[in-house]
């Protein structure tokens, strides 16, 4: 989450309600009991949209595990943890983080772990998302473009996998947001907005979100 980071997650959900949000999402909620998050969602009537798999060992710089060939066991444990947590709080999706890796073995590993995630998520009605990260903020991250993500989604061949289209990352990676949004809409499961280049409030910066939101509405 980008807002109310000074609060614990249940209180941040309550703050979102007071700010007239009707839904929330979070990154890594695992230091908070799922029942406490579930209670805050029930109290406020807000919907939890989604959460991420653990990054791994953040002290050594991990940013996901699922494309790292030698860490499949850890990656699948993180997937299981995320899906089990999600089963308690009923979000729409789980974002499976790839991590820092490259090459054919990393690709093969990521596809295999995503197939595992999709199969594990089906009984819970969850969608699995993947998200390209830009090379300025996450140099060396395995999933580095929307084209690569599209190829992987096609290879996984699961009904419950989709693209997280983070406008901030896509603009820094490739630009041309309007056309990319139109081209990729059939595989997009979730869209995120933030200003470019400072990743702040979307009401300023290099991208006109007024235009982009209107374009998205027309596409839908």
Predicted feature descriptions by range:
Residues 149, 208-209:
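Glycine-rich S-adenosyl-L-methionine
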Residues 41, 121-122, 217:
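A short helix-and-adjacent loop within the catalytic ATP-binding
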Residues 1-87, 150, 154, 158, ...:
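N-terminal pre-domain/capping segments
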């Amino acid at each position: 989450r980008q807002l109310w980071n000074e609060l614990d997650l249940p209180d941040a959900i309550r703050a979102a309600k007071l700010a007239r949000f009707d839904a929330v999402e979070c990154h890594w909620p695992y230091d908070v009991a799922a029942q406490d998050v579930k209670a805050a969602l029930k109290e406020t009537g807000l919907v939890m949209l989604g959460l991420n798999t653990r990054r791994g060992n953040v002290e050594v710089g991990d940013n996901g595990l699922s494309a790292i060939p030698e860490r499949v066991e850890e990656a699948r444990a993180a997937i299981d943890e995320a899906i089990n947590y999600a089963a308690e709080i009923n979000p729409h999706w789980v974002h499976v983080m790839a991590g820092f890796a490259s090459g054919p073995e990393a690709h093969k590993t990521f596809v295999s772990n995503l197939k595992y995630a999709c199969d594990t998520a089906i009984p819970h009605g969850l969608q699995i998302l993947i998200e390209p990260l830009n090379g300025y903020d996450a140099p060396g991250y395995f999933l580095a473009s929307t084209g690569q993500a599209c190829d992987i989604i096609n290879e996984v061949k699961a009904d419950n996998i989709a693209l997280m289209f983070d406008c901030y990352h896509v603009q820094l990676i490739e630009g041309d947001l309007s056309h990319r949004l139109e081209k990729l809409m059939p595989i997009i499961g979730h869209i995120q907005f933030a200003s470019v280049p400072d990743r702040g409030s979307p009401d300023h910066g290099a991208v006109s979100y007024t235009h982009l939101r209107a374009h998205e509405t027309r596409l839908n």
